[in-house]
Amino acid sequence: MIKAVYGDYQPLAAPGAIIQGPHYRFTILTSRLIRAEYSPTGTFYDGQTQTVLNRDFPVPHYEIREREDLLEIITDHVLIQYDKQAFSREGLVFKLRGYFSIYHSDWHYGDPIQDLGGTAQTLDHANGAVPLERGLMSRFGFSVLDDSQSLQLTQDGWYQVKQGNSQDFYYFGYGHDYRACLADFYRLTGPQPLLPKYALGNWWSRFYRYSEATYRQLIERFEAEGLPFTVAVIDMDWHVVSVPPQYGSGWTGYTWNEELFPDPAGFMAWLHQHGLRITLNVHPADGVRPFESMYQQMAQELGLDWEGGEYVVFDPTSPRFLEAYFKHLHHPKEEQGVDFWWIDWQQGQTVKGVDPLWVLNHYHYHDIQARGPQGITFSRYAGPGSHRYPVGFSGDSHMTWESLDFQPYFTATASNIGYGWWSHDIGGHIFGYRDNELALRWYQLGVFSPIMRLHSSSSEFLGKEPWRYPEPYASSMKDYLRLRHRLLPYLYTMNYRAAYQAQPLIEPLYYQHPEEEAAYEIANQYYFGSQIMVMPLTQPRHKGSLCSRFDGWLPEGTWYDIQTGLRYSGGRSLSIYRPLERMGLFAKAGAILPLSGEDGTDNSLANPSVLAIKVFTGADGHFDLVEEAETATDTLAGTAFLTTGLTFVDGKVFKLEPQGTGLRTYELTFVGACLTDLELAGQGRLVDVSHNDQGDSLVRLEADGPVTLSFKQAPRDSQQVRLDVIFSYIEQAQMENQAKDQIWALVKKDMPLAYKMLELQGLGLDREVIEPVIELLVTEP
């Protein structure tokens, strides 16, 4: 029997949390999370489901008021009124206590829920927006998760279709405390697993007829260009696709195409030697047919007439089939070198009540994890609870601006159902058109997405290799690939946060700013971990300004443009304008951003010997960097962690508190500040103190234990930085030369900012040409 058991979770609720009658049962999991069940037969299910694993919560305070025809349950946050009959709109109401709206805080059973959206199974063939399934977050303060039709998990590791027509749902009444809502959802359903570090780097993927030789040439070209990739995705042409016509299409296959890959084990060993993990694409729907190399063994094991050519039908309801499926189709290839599988299921349900996609995700993830903690799956979303099976494959989107424009919102909103590790076809997969700017903007979004996976279709004209684009696109693409790899220390820490602190990498703005209208109105802006806010560019640039615009919002406080170091005042809406090579990346004063101090040109996953730390001055800050211990291996013992505490007290000290990392070089950039009178105490030494072109202090030190850097701090002079950025913009803008001279003269003119802005607007030039200058003028000194 396949063993897919969640033994670490307790599906039985505490007896004190249960209120039960002949046909109903309420379980008060928290004061804001209530399970409600109605069973015509009076039987209730206490086991795990495909969505829910754990109901072992501390019993909250609640009160009961009861008479013959009415049950009232009162918690600190919710009032439930129930007539003790079959659930109905008139007989069951949940009332959220506290003001969220005049009348929308009451939910009558069966009423539609107005939530903020969740995610969707796929973006296959999407050219822009697609409808989203339900999420947990709502401006009205409540949502409902219906578990009535979920598969039931059995203690022997299998599943069963639920019998009967009982109702079983979970009411979430968390108001606008969205993070608490998500944390309790993870407690109920299980957390997002920790991803192996390799999954956070750059993935190369293409639906293309590679051979072993051409794939090696590609990887060697990446290495020569200094482009770091950590995952090699090999699409379906790894297996035989030209099959005898009596067997139908070659979409499903498990036999290596030895014309293209004569030595699969040697090829994959070579990829491993070059620092790449490997995934193969599989379409399981057609089962195993007689032309497959492993057909006879598998058919014999299943008792089929292999001599007569009886097909091995794909049957997700059969434990025997799945045992043989892994034993004969997958494990041998994993022994050859496959690290994980891309499960490309595109069909619907084959048996009533059973979604084969969920079955594949569930058992593939458990199977690969049983072979070591570095395994993952790569597959489409299969409903609530799918966050337990990362990574998500969003499908075959169109290569259009419309598709790009939808992806930031789609990715952030998926957090509303706990689904934090989407992988998109960066650059788009099919149809659409060639647009160099679109390709670069998609690269940029990919770097600040959960997973950075380039992909395209088989057309000879659709390759995403940077060298297939002209300058300046190619150089910028290369820079962003290297930046993604340099972000690994930060990304791994956020990966740890997602797994152990119930906060996904990407969060919509309203998670941190639930009472701000702008946080709901600006769909594409999001937080990328705890230290970065992203305004992605998803519209073509203006022909005159050569900049793309994003209409965004900065929360209260002081914010820095991470790429220029310019400082912005928050608490306002604004339009930002960025040339091709830059995007909207902001860090708040007090943010601490760790990066690899190496140049990002090789794909090493070792903890960097040089750590580059950007400290955004103007407020105190703290960041706990989490890294894998160098001794961590692919064993069932799991992963060991190293923590480095980074603390900044504005204007006074910076503290480094490494634990077990050994001697390391640290390159500190104090963005927005000039430091003097530096003194270092502790287990380290100052190596060098200098300044960058923006006037920020750069401090290089070595430490093998805790150190404290004391200093005096003064704000840098940002005026020249601002002028340099404005000059660069005006120089490249496509406009009349006389207009450039007029703009530059006004920029340098000594006059109040308000008058300067009025005069610029009075020049009669296109708004899209003038507004970038005004944006830069109003940055803080």
Question: Where would I find each of the regions flagged by the language model?
Answer:
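Solvent-exposed beta-hairpin/edge-strand motifs
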Residues: 52, 552-564, 669-685
